[in-house]
Amino acid sequence: MMRSRSKSPRRPSPTARGANCDVELLKTTTRDREELKCMLEKYERHLAEIQGNVKVLKSERDKIFLLYEQAQEEITRLRREMMKSCKSPKSTTAHAILRRVETERDVAFTDLRRMTTERDSLRERLKIAQETAFNEKAHLEQRIEELECTVHNLDDERMEQMSNMTLMKETISTVEKEMKSLARKAMDTESELGRQKAENNSLRLLYENTEKDLSDTQRHLAKKKYELQLTQEKIMCLDEKIDNFTRQNIAQREEISILGGTLNDLAKEKECLQACLDKKSENIASLGESLAMKEKTISGMKNIIAEMEQASRQCTEALIVCEQDVSRMRRQLDETNDELAQIARERDILAHDNDNLQEQFAKAKQENQALSKKLNDTHNELNDIKQKVQDTNLEVNKLKNILKSEESENRQMMEQLRKANEDAENWENKARQSEADNNTLKLELITAEAEGNRLKEKVDSLNREVEQHLNAERSYKSQISTLHKSVVKMEEELQKVQFEKVSALADLSSTRELCIKLDSSKELLNRQLVAKDQEIEMRENELDSAHSEIELLRSQMANERISMQNLEALLVANRDKEYQSQIALQEKESEIQLLKEHLCLAENKMAIQSRDVAQFRNVVTQLEADLDITKRQLGTERFERERAVQELRRQNYSSNAYHMSSTMKPNTKCHSPERAHHRSPDRGLDRSLEENLCYRDF
């Protein structure tokens, strides 16, 4: 179990797991230390019990030796008394004493047997204690080795944690640098986004102004178209009326010429008649006499004159009718003049509207001062209508090319939008990589700048187109002025009206074509404006997404800061834990040293106990020898007692007493070295016990 625990912290783990493993190792080491302390306390208690048992056995042995010596002294005393009073009447008392001695001997035998059994049990206990001591010693040595391994592992882990701490510090410094760079980049991106917002706002304002101008121009163009249509219709009506009037004028002129011819004929006839009258008056005066003769001729002439008067009356009536027709024609001419004046007024209103448009476009000019020179050059270059028509054709071609280029640009923008969508998906997939996000943001900013430049170029192109439309309107205005001049000239020269009408029709056809082209260009511009609105909305969405990404980056920055603070707190906690683990290791080392000292003391105690055991073995062998000696002595005493009984029976006390005294002397001589021999191991045991007590006190 301890080997598996010591190998487990070698695995690479995070700081929290390492801290938990350190806490678990500290807990296990404290538990092992407490268990070892408990084992040592149990072992010490067991040793104290063994020592107490040894002391009790020593005290019992001393008591037995004292009792044995007392019994021997009593036996010797009784023998002496028996020797002294062998023939006295106190033999009964001697027999009683012998019986008592025999009973005491039996008790001593039982005590010896009990002592032998206790000796065997003590031997077994000593063997068991030695085996347990050796096992505990091996277990403690193994535990000490395992603890040393754990200490080495803890040192290795501490070194690994120190290296990890250094690596974490380096990573923290690099992350802080990256955070600072990211913060700088975020600030740069924010400033760039603010600048782009300002540019976009300015572009929006310009776009709104252009939209307003375009809406105004479209309204004015619609009004002008409607007015042009009305003028065209009026011009067509006027052309028809002029044609009718010209026809009527031609017919009336022909009639007037006929009537003039008739009037001339009549005048000639009048002159002839007056001449005739003069001649006739002269003839009457000369031929007064021939009146009677010529009354018939006069009556006939009167009839002729009446007829002539009737004819003259008819002529006067015809003249009156002609005068009425002339007055009516004059009225019609006045009406045509009034209509032409109304047309002139309408043209003046159109001119005034055009002046207002010119003023509005002058305001647009003031906004686009950089292009005023080009406008003046183009205004100076586009004075003639034919050149303007050619220029308008060229401009139409240019507009077509521009539309084609804008369509290609729209396609490119659609491709860019698809690419942007794909990039957005890639951004969503790669949102975790801050550096890649920053690079993509930079690329997006560059593309946004390029697109802003493109939008600026498109706005410039739109301004150019507006200026071209202004030029076209100016050309229209010049055409209208020429038409006004032509109408004024029509009043002076009706014959040139047809030619001017043809030119006006050509101009109107060109203006119609231009209006159609302007309508198509307006529709294209509306489409472009819608596309640009969509693009602006896309850009706004992209800006919103960029803002959201920036907010996400800020939140990531805040989370990283919080994680940094947590890491710092973990580092501080790890440092505290390392300090505590170092303190615990020092305590463990001190405890291990104490355990080593206890083991040394235990080994010394074991050595002392082994010595004591050897001494006990020697004592046991001595006791066995003493028991053999006591058995021999008892055998000899039995033999002596039997002999004494036989001698008492034989009542040969004197000879037997002398013989017994002679036998007792060598016995006493034999007992004296035995006593010395018995006392010598007692003294050795006392010395060994005193040494054990000294070691224990130490």
Curated annotation (Swiss-Prot):
Q: Compositional bias of type Basic and acidic residues: which residue ranges?
A: 671-685
Q: What does this protein do?
A: Plays a role in spermatogenesis. When overexpressed, prevents nuclear localization of HIF1A.
Recorded disease: Spermatogenic failure 26: An autosomal recessive infertility disorder caused by spermatogenesis defects that result in acephalic spermatozoa.
| Polar residues bias: start-end ranges | 659-670
Expression across tissues is:
Expressed in the testis, in spermatozoa (at protein level). Expressed in actively dividing fetal tissues, including sternum, intestine, limb, kidney and stomach.
Q: What is this protein called?
A: Testis-specific gene 10 protein
Write out the annotated subcellular location. Answer: Cytoplasm; Cytoplasm, Cytoskeleton, Microtubule organizing center, Centrosome, Centriole
Q: Which keywords fit this entry according to its UniProt record?
A: Cytoplasm, Cytoskeleton, Phosphoprotein
Location of the region described as Disordered in the Swiss-Prot/TrEMBL record: 659-685
Q: Name one GO cellular component term.
A: cytoplasm
Highest taxon, organism lineage: Eukaryota
Write out the similarity annotation.
Answer: Belongs to the CEP135/TSGA10 family.
> Region Interaction with HIF1A: which residues?
556-689
Q: What is its main location?
A: cytoplasm
Q: Which residues carry this modification: Phosphoserine?
A: S163, S688
**Which Gene Ontology BP terms does the record give?**
cell projection assembly; spermatogenesis
Subunit and partners: Interacts with HIF1A.
**Post-translational modifications:** Processed into N-terminal 27-kDa and C-terminal 55-kDa fragments.
Source organism per entry reads Homo sapiens (Human)
